[in-house]
Amino acid sequence: MMRHNLSGTGIAIVTPFLEGGGVDFIGLEKLLNHIIEGGVDYIVVLGTTGESVVLSADEKIAVTNFVKETVDGRKPLVMGIGGNNTCAVSDTIKNTDLSGYDAILSVSPYYNKPTQEGIYQHYKALSANSPLPIILYNVPGRTSSNISAETTLRLANDFDNIIAVKEASGDMYQIMKIIKYRPEGFLVISGDDGLTLPMIYMGADGVISVVGQAYPKEFSNMVRYALEGNQKVANKLHLSLIHI
């Protein structure tokens, strides 16, 4: 059921700020209602787009609680929890109130440039400490290290609570390899708005989008039509959005 609920269009929401530097909760409420009314399938909080790395611990708690209360069960919620310190990320997962959330999105370790075995061991530790399903997040343009197809597939096969990968490598050969050899039920999610349609046509399950929060109806319709096999309408919507 959870795997099904996280297909389609997820939105990695921004964290709006006031001029003085605090979180703009009025703006955040408007954004949440806007994307829900636009028909998106689920919402991702504290991802890269949400500027999680610059939020204080108190701000993260305030934002995740506010989102949970505002959404109030209308859409599944995913919380971003990641970092390059395996012990620290594991402790954060164990000590965070995850009630009301359906999964964790965890970016691969950055800066340290771990080996593939190091990446595997990192996620193995997170899997052991997480009460929620985990979505791997591969974005080598930001982390400086790629999760190879082999490592993604190894994690997908070895740990039942690692249920998906958000793939933002831009490497279509790698992505197709994951799609071809993934275990049943493992989701492949686009992490690149511009590659969403070709990835779905290759067998991917949807997207965690940024631009979709500005155009939630158009973007979620594009994904929905593509997943249903209506390429003509999906292509038309894609071309109308490609300039953004």
Give each language-model segment a name:
Residues 1-2, 239:
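Intrinsic low-complexity, intrinsically disordered segments enriched in polar/basic residues
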Residues 142-239:
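Catalytic alpha/beta core domains of metabolic enzymes, predominantly
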